[in-house]
Swiss-Prot record:
Keywords: Developmental protein, Differentiation, Disulfide bond, Secreted, Signal, Wnt signaling pathway. One of its GO terms (biological process) is response to xenobiotic stimulus. Residues 171-294 form the NTR domain. Residues 1-24 form the signal peptide. Induction: Up-regulated in mammary gland tumors. This is Secreted frizzled-related protein 2. It comes from Canis lupus familiaris. Pfam families: Fz, NTR. GO terms for cellular component: collagen-containing extracellular matrix; extracellular space. Disulfide bonds join 39-102, 49-95, 86-124, 113-151, 117-141, 171-244, 174-246, 189-294. GO terms for molecular function: endopeptidase activator activity; fibronectin binding; integrin binding; receptor ligand activity; Wnt-protein binding. The FZ domain is involved in binding with Wnt ligands. The gene is SFRP2. InterPro entries: Frizzled/SFRP (IPR015526), Frizzled_dom (IPR020067), Frizzled_dom_sf (IPR036790), Netrin_domain (IPR001134), Netrin_module_non-TIMP (IPR018933), SFRP2_CRD (IPR041764), TIMP-like_OB-fold (IPR008993). CDD domains: CRD_SFRP2, NTR_Sfrp1_like.
């Protein structure tokens, strides 16, 4: 027998024994009446909602995704925001939209409460802004019902600031190692490529970050066993990055000095440093790299 929906949802249902009609939330689309046949098991590879307290979700979801493929493609981009731990209920809020709970005895959709959205937005919108992304219109809190309606509530204040929660570890490639010029040159000689790049797009596949480069803003400093054909793909990888944070690479509009190795046909980043425009250190490093013979 599958387990029940969890204490949170039981509390929601208990407080609303007599339900009126609830409107679907398809942003800019007509209301939609869900049917029980639209309940789907939450797949194991929907990592955004891994460990959520219910097992079945509705399709289409509250963001208008009609297939599981769409959900998986779009949900991965939000995993880093959860990893930033800007609010304890970020995952709950996002999963209530990407994978809304589906209960056997309830045909209506359960949306996130207005207060849940407001709290998450207040804490997480500044984090998104630092990455160059505004809070999207589809997540505007005025779209969600007030707390006296049937909705997913904010956690109790007892759980807002977990005292024992460990700080997320920093990705090895993103650690500030306080290297001098000699250290940087030594690191470069150990790697297969060194590039100055700007980021066009970041996506997330399984546990890894896929970084798509702006092709016209790329400067090549070193290639060893890496062909021009490899670089034409304009794709770099930051491995296992969803298990750690990378503050060094938190601005999609900034240029970066990246070094790495070719592993299994992929260009994998082992070191990343934000390139401060006009900074003397990077101008000096740039000259040193061009003269370097490993």
């Amino acid at each position: 027998m599958p387990r029940g929906p969890g204490s949170l949802l039981l509390l929601v249902l208990a407080s609303h024994c007599c339900l009126g009609s609830a409107r679907g939330l398809f942003f800019g689309q007509p209301d939609f009446s869900y049917k029980r046949s639209n309940c789907k098991p939450i797949p194991a590879n929907l990592q955004l909602c891994h460990g959520i307290e219910y097992q079945n979700m509705r399709l289409p979801n509250l963001l208008g995704h009609e297939t599981m493929k769409e959900v998986l493609e779009q949900a991965g981009a939000w995993i880093p925001l959860v990893m930033k731990q800007c609010h304890p209920d970020t995952k709950k809020f996002l999963c209530s939209l990407f994978a809304p709970v589906c209960l056997d005895d309830l045909d209506e959709t359960i949306q996130p409460c207005h207060s849940l959205c407001v709290q998450v937005k207040d804490r997480c919108a500044p984090v998104m802004s630092a990455f160059g992304f505004p809070w999207p219109d589809m997540l505007e809190c005025d779209r969600f019902p007030q707390d006296n309606d049937l909705c997913i509530p904010l956690a109790s204040s007892d759980h807002l600031l977990p005292a024992t929660e460990e700080a997320p570890k920093v990705c090895e490639a993103c650690k500030n190692k306080n290297e001098d010029d000699n250290d940087i040159m030594e690191t470069l000689c150990k790697n297969d490529f060194a590039l100055k790049i700007k980021v066009k797009e970041i996506t997330y596949i399984n546990r890894d970050t896929k970084i798509i480069l702006e092709t016209k803003s790329k400067t090549i400093y070193k290639l060893n066993g890496v062909s021009e054909r490899d670089l034409k793909k304009s794709v770099l990888w930051l491995k296992d990055s969803l298990q750690c944070t990378c503050e060094e690479m938190n601005d999609i509009n900034a240029p970066y000095l990246v070094m790495g190795q070719k592993l299994g046909g992929e260009l994998v980043i082992t070191s990343v440093k934000r390139w401060q425009k006009g900074q003397r250190e990077f101008k000096r490093i740039s000259r040193s790299i061009r003269k370097l013979q490993c």
